[in-house]
Amino acid sequence: AMTNMAKVICDKLATMTFSEQCDISVDDEKYNDTVSKVLENNCFWERFPEFLSRAYALGGGIIKVYLEDNVIRLNYINADRFFPTKWNNRQITEGIFCNDYVQNGYFYKLFEYHTLQSDGVHIYHILRRSDSRSYLGQSVPVSELFPKLEYERVFKGVQTPLFCYFKPAVGNNMVFDLPLGLPVFANSIDTLREIDVIFDSLEREFILGKKRIIIPSECIKSIYDSDGNEVKYFDTDDEVYQAFNADDAPKLNISDNTQSLRVTEHVEALKLQLNILSTQLGFSPGTLSFDSNSGVKTATEVAADEKDTLRLSLIHI
């Protein structure tokens, strides 16, 4: 059994840092109308919360702008489909996107290389084909899979990247040479595993702790086979009664052998691990809880008790 705490964490952070009350606006009224229309046409308000949750899980995300029939579109790209090639202290300016396709029994990889040059943004498309998903394969013309796609496309006069990379506010202590982010739970993997071990053990408690009644085998119904031998049979679907043979059958009484459940011990262990996880993530103690014994709190109490959680959400924003 698993608690899926990693997803719970990412969903919680996503709702804290982006909600329906969020507003995106531009000072210039003309551009503001354009931006609002682009966001609306690309289902930004519906798709971004889920996309943001994945970004917390994967260590980042990219929103890429492209044209489709002269209409501005947004592509929500997971961090594992992007590799940066050039960056500065502010942002990633160049990078390669990778997309996988399957057609006619072949596996294709389309690489989209974004570069900033003196005359504008240059985008190069490179297509590779392979018989196996595991191999990069050989280079083939882009037209083999995309007849209308050009090898190179230039957006003259554009001096800003046509994509925006963002990442969680978690220092990357695993890869120092790349400006990439880490999943918010990257340094809490051991704790997440421990939580799942405890939760799995709790589930096993209910399986192993089912009612068990020991009975002498003489109490089991019997039938006679074709040879006239007595054969005892037992309902294999019955999980309550357990039959035993004994040398001294009269001393073997019907007895309840049900084991008591160790629910309290498991819950306390889960609470401890969840508090450790909250500390590792930067949440306030008790933010992640297995049960709720605190009752209703006022807004002032919530703000006081969860100041670390509120501070963490502001950092990610």
Model-derived features with residue positions:
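Extended, regular secondary-structure scaffolds
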Residues: 62-181
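Extended, charged amphipathic alpha-helical segments
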Residues: 145-308
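Conserved small/polar residues in nucleotide/adenosyl-binding loops
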Residues: 315-317
